[in-house]
Amino acid sequence: MVLRIEDLDPRAQSPEAARLIMDDLRWLGLDWDEGPYYQSKRSEVYATAIERLGAGTPGRPGRGLTYPCFCTRSELHAASAPHASDGTYVYAGTCRNLNAAEVARRSAARPPATRLRVPDAEDPAGTIDFVDMAYGPQREVLATECGDFLVRRSDGVVAYQLAVVVDDGEMGVTEVVRGHDLLGSCARQMYLQRLLGYREPRYGHVPLLVAPDGRRLSKREHDLDLGVLRERYGTSGPILGAVASRLGLAEPGESVTADELVGRFSWDVIARHAADIVVDERFLP
């Protein structure tokens, strides 16, 4: 297991927050073999990858697939382009073919973001097929599901899709397990892996913890605050047991450790319990 602190956004760069995350992981019995690696300290690695996707460097030509994008967030949300299944917009290619003079004129007003071209819908290279370990066969046509996507924001912050692909590739990650809200990111990440020459890991997505109204639980709303639960229960067994029982890996009310769950884990079982887990007054004992 590789521990990576995904703190690309300057607002997320908090040593105290990282310390609390690691403390909570240890308390839950989740240890790691490598890290922690901080994305905020890897900007040069990401910049090199973007150069390879774009014009390249002297003596090492790139793929020529990136271009500057001047669209604002409000313009993108106001556009009539369709939206993908995860709610994000499908980029309409507004800035895709700007000439050099227009790029220079707009750049004088504000810095652009960097966007990556995807193949046309008719091009087989833009159709991504893979098998998720829980949700089975998946297919996405990049041109119709997302369009050209960001690899760097206008403020210079590297996009999540690019950063995790570079990190997974450079760190030798072979399996990625995460919430199913990121299932729609797989095709973009696999496209980047193929362009950059990285091995494609296996992906497994798991259910989310949601409120009774279906809202995804969030740290911002202090939903199911782990600090409060630590004070209430003292040990992690009841919490792990509550989650594991909803996934078919434990009996209702059973207290288990992370080590005990290792021997019980099965993707086949997870696939049969792939619905989101509702957290209400009956969730914890």
Positions of PLM-derived features:
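Short C-terminal domain-edge/linker segments immediately following a structured domain
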Residues: 32-36, 147, 193-196, 207-208, ...
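A short, terminal or domain-edge coil/loop segment
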Residues: 53-68, 123-130, 135, 253-273
